[in-house]
Amino acid sequence: MAAKDVVFGDSARAKMVEGVNILANAVKVTLGPKGRNVVLERSFGGPTVTKDGVSVAKEIELKDKLQNMGAQMVKEVASKTSDNAGDGTTTATVLAQSIVREGMKYVASGMNPMDLKRGIDKAVAAAVEELKKISKPCTTNKEIAQVGAISANSDSSIGDRIAEAMDKVGKEGVITVEDGKSLADELDVVEGMQFDRGYLSPYFINNPDKQVAVLENPFVLLHDKKVSNIRDLLPVLEQVAKAGRPLLIIAEDVEGEALATLVVNNIRGILKTVAVKAPGFGDRRKAMLEDIAILTGGQVIAEETGLTLEKATLAELGQAKRIEVGKENTTIIDGAGEAVNIEARVKQIRTQIEEATSDYDREKLQERVAKLAGGVAVIKVGAATEVEMKEKKARVEDALHATRAAVEEGIVPGGGVALIRARTAIASLTGVNADQNAGIKIVLRAMEEPLRQIVTNGGEEASVVVAAVAAGKGNYGYNAATGEYVDMVEAGVVDPTKVTRTALQNAASVAGLLLTTDAAVAELPKEDAPMPGGMPGGMGGMGMGMGMDM
């Protein structure tokens, strides 16, 4: 085990604060509409230019172990805020730096760090309650577009695209971001339920131009086992043929003579069918089959429910208006399921989302809700170069997270104004002793900092603007993009409440930990082994002489 360096008290804190400042100073220049760019070196290819705070934070690794600890703690603030709210990483970093900086002054003057932390926590809890009061619901397309634009570093085209996507697939719909093929951004919307399984044989294709199989007004047979014996399928195939409608078979697999017979019937025009594998694996496959059954108004033919293929009737089959089956995807449009049943299923899955412990499970459950409740929209990001594409794609993903957060918890005036208003409301808050009061003061000072930084990045005098905004009321604030004092909500400068709340809570949490740190343990740098000795000196008189006359 390598030897460790143990540092105590002020020495430990001072080094960690240096790391906090290095990281925060690099990140905070990106804040606001006039935020500056940061250039990140890449081990191969050209450098990346970004205005995304979390991208900058992730790149920073310091040589000094103690400085690096401080930097990593603030990096945690940025990434946690990004994970929870999708945006607000730079705001969180600025808040954390301010709380640490002000807090260290009080700790150095001999105040009790634990009481300071209690004061900080008390002020943050009161500020969060105040933010909830200021918050208003985000419902209109215009508001959603504004949130998206602000989060994408004041790019209104990204905000408009996200608002359009949410309008098409609903607030719960799945919106994914992909690399585009052209210079312009594009929006593709898939209505209905889509899952990532395609036809089992290209002979099912009936639209050669698009290379898809299209079934109009089909029945849907859902089975949770493999189908290889055609005799099991014959009774239900005969009933479907009599009804004169096409059939989609979704099963664990369709193989052997069963698949061959379906293909032959399809080619001869006797019965139009398409077979696809069921989506997902294991328990998730059963759940997704159940989802499709509810969407199409059918039942899953499974032994557990006492149903068998041989005895299946048309009543157990689902129905849809139209189904498109491609090489890799199947889309069910306008299933015949009852709206009441679909809503009940969505409610059930939402309960599972709340109880889910892993991010992966939560994401998969949210996808299922979206497929049942809305549809799927794909935003294809267009750019001229690979570097621009990566940077723009990251901004679109940030903006998408932020708009979801806004729909979830509402919006507050942006540009640091919400924190100034919350600050005014809790200015009279007091703790049980002078040290706690100092902790409250630390938070009150920190809540000005995002506005100060936005103004500084815009090249204006921060103190003048902060005083002017603090003297105002409601949504009155400073729009750094235009350099004017306006009603921030009317001007479209808004932030999701969740983003501002999460940034403040995470910043205070990590800053509080730093202030109450009294020892730091880091690995000692390894000493390089001495270089091996050089070759011995040359061999005396072995020059050109060698005793010969030249």
UniProtKB/Swiss-Prot annotation:
GO CC, alphabetical: cytoplasm
Major subcellular location class: cytoplasm
Keywords, ordered alphabetically: ATP-binding, Chaperone, Cytoplasm, Isomerase, Nucleotide-binding
Binding residues for ATP: 30-33, 51, 87-91, 415, 479-481, 495
Reactions accelerated catalytically: ATP + H2O + a folded polypeptide = ADP + phosphate + an unfolded polypeptide
EC class: isomerase
Function summary: Together with its co-chaperonin GroES, plays an essential role in assisting protein folding. The GroEL-GroES system forms a nano-cage that allows encapsulation of the non-native substrate proteins and provides a physical environment optimized to promote and accelerate protein folding.
NCBIfam families: GroEL (TIGR02348), PRK00013.1 (NF000592), PRK12849.1 (NF009487), PRK12850.1 (NF009488), PRK12851.1 (NF009489)
Family note: Belongs to the chaperonin (HSP60) family.
Descriptive protein name: Chaperonin GroEL
